[in-house]
Amino acid sequence: MQVPKNNIYTVSRLNGEVRQILEGQLGKVWLNGEISNFSAPSSGHWYLTLKDHYSQIRCAMFKGRNQSVSFKPVNGQQVLVKGAISVYEPRGDYQLLIESMLPAGDGLLAQQFEALKMKLAAQGLFAADTKRQLPKNIQRIGVITSPTGAAIRDVLHVLARRDPSIEVIIYPTQVQGENADMNICQAINIANQRLEVDVLLLTRGGGSLEDLWCFNSEALAHTIYNSALPVVSAVGHEVDTTISDYVADVRAPTPSAGAELLSQDSDNKSQRLATVLSRLKQSASHYQLKQEKRLSLLEHRLQRLDPKRTLQQFEQRFDEMQLRLEAALSNKLHGLSRRQQQLANRLEQQSPKHKLALETNRLSYLATRLQDAMQDTLNQSEQRITYAAHQLETVSPLATLSRGYSITTDANNQVIDNAAQLSVGDKINTRLRHGQVQSTVTQITDES
């Protein structure tokens, strides 16, 4: 066997070239697997093995990376990781250097996130040359968020502290759950239809990847991109990143940071105003000097012309302008006076005193009608009672007695209308028109 003289590798050289090949060709990869042999030494680094049913690979996640992981990994847990293939040269072991780690459930969402991110980037929605500049002097901010969440309280607190002069218009929307993305799109479209603010602040507090998923909507990305108003995305905490952050004109890490970005400190604003006033005074001074020079030149030219004639023309023009100004002022004052009278009439009509007078008259009218109706009802009732009394009197037994008849009852006060009801010796009572008569039956005659 012939040994080559110039192509003999050392172990270190071989491991180094293998490392360069793996890192250069594979780059970053996503890997799904089960954690085993997890260890977290005092250095702060994590070491673990990812495995499936057939294979396994050693992994390392250094302290600077694992501090952003929101959970503590445990053996047997399914995770989705992103990292770079490398070779640990001292042992010749190839391994995965993990950059980010998510639970397997969040991992599926992360894959969808990356796929949508690549798609929208290819469409140019993240291009830097499409980003709009924020207005320099923001007077009114439109906040798109939940009106009851912590984010709006943070935003209002920061604005009140830094620049109370900024007005805030809240476009209430759902910021979590089903159809939240379409709800946010509708709020952005409403703001663009009204065009009543200088800039939009899309914001909510922190949460899990699933909680913030509505901000990773393709429809929302296109709505933000097509917005005529500049959009600042301030969603979640500093470690959270959403599609809305990439497509918005500016990204702020938190709601409070978004409010600070869109406001100026009161002291800085006063200093800036003083600078503007100073520049304005300088401009006015320069303008005055310029006009004085121009006036001097005109005076010199005027001396070469007929001063009296020129003056007469100026006086005539001045008179015309004065008349036009007086007419305009008169018309304006007349219009204002008429408008004032109209407003006074409308105010009088809307005055509580006027309404009270109308209601008082109406109440008096209703009271009169009620009293008349009660009197009519009382009169009708009296007439019916009188008629009924007359009818009762007509059929009353007492009325029969007044015509000369009598009523006879036995000892039990039973009315006797047949002689067969009595026997000789019975006691009977006869009621006349005036008084009663008690009798004893001595004879009974049957006249039937």
From Swiss-Prot:
It catalyses: Exonucleolytic cleavage in either 5'- to 3'- or 3'- to 5'-direction to yield nucleoside 5'-phosphates. This is Exodeoxyribonuclease 7 large subunit. InterPro entries: Exonuc_VII_L, Exonuc_VII_lsu_C, OB-fold_nuc-bd_dom. It is an enzyme of class 3 (hydrolase). GO terms for cellular component: cytoplasm; exodeoxyribonuclease VII complex. One of its GO terms (molecular function) is exodeoxyribonuclease VII activity. Its EC number is 3.1.11.6. GO terms for biological process: DNA catabolic process. Belongs to the XseA family. Keywords: Cytoplasm, Exonuclease, Hydrolase, Nuclease. Heterooligomer composed of large and small subunits. It is found in: Cytoplasm. Bidirectionally degrades single-stranded DNA into large acid-insoluble oligonucleotides, which are then degraded further into small acid-soluble oligonucleotides. Pfam families: Exonuc_VII_L (PF02601), tRNA_anti_2 (PF13742).
